[in-house]
Structure formats: C-alpha cells, structure tokens
Amino acid sequence: MMPVRPLIRIVLGASVALACESATAAAQGAGEKVAKAKHALDRAAEERQTKRATARFDPIFKKYTKRYFGVGTDWRWFKAQGMAESDLTPGARSRVGARGIMQLMPATYGQIRTALPGFGAIDNPEWNIAAGILHDRDLWTLWKPDVDESERWHFVFAGYNAGEGTIIRARKAASAAKLDNRTWPNIERVAPRVERWRYAETLDYVKKIRANKDSLSPR
C-alpha cells in the first residue's frame, strides 16, 4: 500500500499539471479569438479601402452610361463589367494585349479614336471606360431589333468577350437545333457545339458581371 504523503504529492502534482494544461488551452483559445477578431477587422478595413479606391471611377461610369445609353440605364452594369475585366485596374494588361479597366484591344480602340478623334490615350481610365461603354452600345444596337431588353445584356457582354461573330454563330446553332435563338439559356445550351469558341470563359464572364452588379450599391 502506498504511503499517504507520496499519494498526496502525486494527486497534487496531477492537479497542478491539469490546471496548467487548462490554463494553456484557455490562453491558446483566447489567442485564437484575438487573431480571428484582428483578421476580421483587417479584412473589413481592406474591403473599405478597396471600395473607396474603386468608387473613384463611379462618376465616369455614370457619365458615359448616360451619354451612350441615355437616362435610366443602370450604370452598375458597366462597373460590374470593369470588375470582371480587370478588377478596375487602370494599368491591367492581358496576355493577348488587351489594356486598361475595360480590357480593350488596341485595334478596337484605334477604330474608336478614328471615329471620335477627341478620345485620348487607351491607358487613360476615363477614355478606356468611355470606349468600353461605347463598344457595348454598338453591341446593344446590334441585338436590339429582335432580342428582348431583359435578355439583351447577356448578348452584349458575351459579344464583348467572344466577339459578335461568335455570338452570331451561336444564334445560328440555336436555330439549327430548333431553339429560340433570342433567349440566353438556349445559347448556353448550344454553346459546346459552336466551333472556335471558348464558351466556358464567356458563359462564366456573363454570370460574373451579373453577380458583380447585384453586389453594387445603386447610388
């Protein structure tokens, strides 16, 4: 039988060890909570900073939406597009040479400048945004005769991404499949059949713009 004193020492030692473990666990838990709270605060501050940084382009999007689409058109469509194109980064460059917030190809921008000599450099945020919205307006006009307004945005942004010729071919594929080629879900349905089209990129692009728009304040 073990003597009482050694037994007491063992029990006390175990109690102290358990208390130390509990204190350590509590300290670790508190540390994790503090770290999580700090991360949340840092993230919120970063989001506020990002919103302030991108909001500086809002007056430009509003100005050229009104100029090229008229009063009543929701300017958020085009900011959402800029977010999808470049995260609203003025100096953005793509691997194929597209430039600026609206990721315009120099050849496309050159055509716009020929028609409108008042446009400045492609890397200037205002002119880049203006040119992107003007290009959207041309696509809007193209689809206007037979595509309902509620569907037309899909066709506009798809044409911007893949080229209007690709979307025309997609519409022909829908017609060949005896589907209504004026509705975007039918274009999505026949997309895999359209040759020379990286359709997954375009379909994702259109979805991303809508999601971006829904996340933006209308002010």
Predicted features by range, described:
Residues 10-19:
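Bacterial N-terminal signal peptides
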Residues 80-87, 103-114, 162-166:
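Glycine-rich, acidic and aromatic/proline-enriched surface loops and short helix-turn segments
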Residues 52-55, 59-63, 67, 80:
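N-terminal targeting leaders of membrane proteins
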Residues 92-112, 175-178:
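Short, surface-exposed glycine/acidic/tryptophan-bearing loops
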Residues 1-11:
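Bacterial N-terminal signal peptides that target proteins for export
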Residues 72-89, 132-133, 156-161, 209:
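Short, functionally critical alpha-helical segments immediately adjacent to catalytic or ligand/cofactor-binding
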Residues 3-5, 23-43, 48-55, 110-134, ...:
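Non-catalytic cell-wall polysaccharide-engagement segments
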Residues 65-73, 145:
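Short, charged helix-capping/linker segments at alpha-helix termini
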